[in-house]
């Protein structure tokens, strides 16, 4: 009786894992839909949930930010009582977006983190296994099979709580993960396992931080860093600060050249209501 609606494309790993393999192996009905979340209107996804009695839905934070710009009436137009969970992944989920969709749906919204290379969640609260409290903006804890470590980018030493580090996994990787690059075993090793001297660890190339309760937060790619007057600033932290403004729907931060500081951050924002600017 379970029906899963994953809004991805088959060309992406989310489509493979959660439109085809996962739901069908589990004996679920799976819905494959081609289109954007606002055509013909911003209620199309919720109409699908109503008409097909969707119980589990999976999409990306960007899609939710797109819906955040639309008339909230579309969320109330359809009966989504069948929906038990909304899963979000594919990019860091900022706290304001997490809060907004949780309050709008009044359903559990599960942030989780993984990569194309892993095929399934690295960090998750696994609500189907045990009921674990979640924190807005956090994909929770390492999934079963992942021996996760946060390492200092320069020293390779494990960092403490509330310290930023590179998200790594001590091998072996669990089943379902990428095991090589086709016909190029050495390339696979050199790309993913040689970032730290004298340490054989799988590198995600993502920044992460762990709080005192053990919850992990993903801060973005290790190459998404702006060097401002010698200070390395992650774009994710700046984007989250800007997106906390109630009239901001989407934001992206990049570094631009500056004669004095080398680089300075510039934010490009999409507002929800242009008449209020």
Model-derived features with residue positions:
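Gly/Ser/Thr-rich phosphate-binding loop
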Residues: 1-4, 21, 25-28, 46, ...
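Active-site glycine-centered loops adjacent to acidic/histidine catalytic or metal-binding residues
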Residues: 9, 90, 114, 140, ...
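ATP-dependent adenylate-forming carboxylate-activation enzymes
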Residues: 9, 28-48, 232-238
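Acidic-histidine catalytic/liganding microenvironments
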Residues: 70, 185, 245-246
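Glycine-centered tight turns that cap/initiate beta-strands
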Residues: 82, 187, 247-250
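Conserved ATP/PPi-binding loop(s) of AMP-dependent carboxylate-activating enzymes
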Residues: 141-145, 157-194, 233
């Amino acid at each position: 009786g379970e029906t899963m609606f994953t809004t991805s494309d088959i060309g992406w790993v989310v489509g493979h894992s959660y439109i085809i393999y996962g739901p069908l192996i589990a004996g679920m009905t799976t819905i494959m839909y081609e289109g954007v979340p606002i055509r013909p209107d911003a209620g199309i996804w919720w109409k699908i949930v109503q008409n097909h009695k969707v119980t589990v839905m999976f999409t990306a934070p960007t899609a939710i930010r797109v819906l955040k710009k639309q008339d909230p009436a579309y969320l109330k137009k359809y009966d989504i009582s069948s929906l038990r969970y909304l899963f979000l992944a594919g990019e860091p989920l900022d706290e304001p977006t997490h809060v907004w969709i949780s309050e709008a749906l009044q359903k559990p919204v599960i942030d989780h983190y993984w990569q194309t290379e892993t095929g399934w969640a690295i960090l998750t609260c696994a609500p189907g296994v045990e009921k674990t409290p979640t924190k807005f903006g956090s994909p929770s804890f390492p999934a079963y099979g992942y021996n996760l470590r946060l390492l200092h980018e320069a020293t390779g030493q494990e960092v403490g709580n509330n310290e930023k580090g590179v998200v790594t996994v001590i091998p072996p990787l669990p089943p379902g993960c990428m095991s090589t690059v086709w016909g190029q075993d050495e390339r696979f090793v050199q790309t993913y396992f040689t970032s730290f001297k004298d340490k054989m660890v799988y590198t995600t190339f993502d920044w992460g931080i762990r709080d005192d309760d053990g919850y992990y937060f993903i801060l973005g790619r290790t190459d998404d860093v702006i060097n401002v007057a010698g200070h390395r600033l992650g774009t994710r932290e700046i984007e989250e600060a800007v997106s906390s403004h109630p009239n901001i729907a989407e934001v992206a931060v990049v570094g631009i050249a500056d004669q004095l500081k080398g680089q300075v951050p510039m934010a490009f924002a999409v507002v929800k209501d242009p008449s209020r600017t």
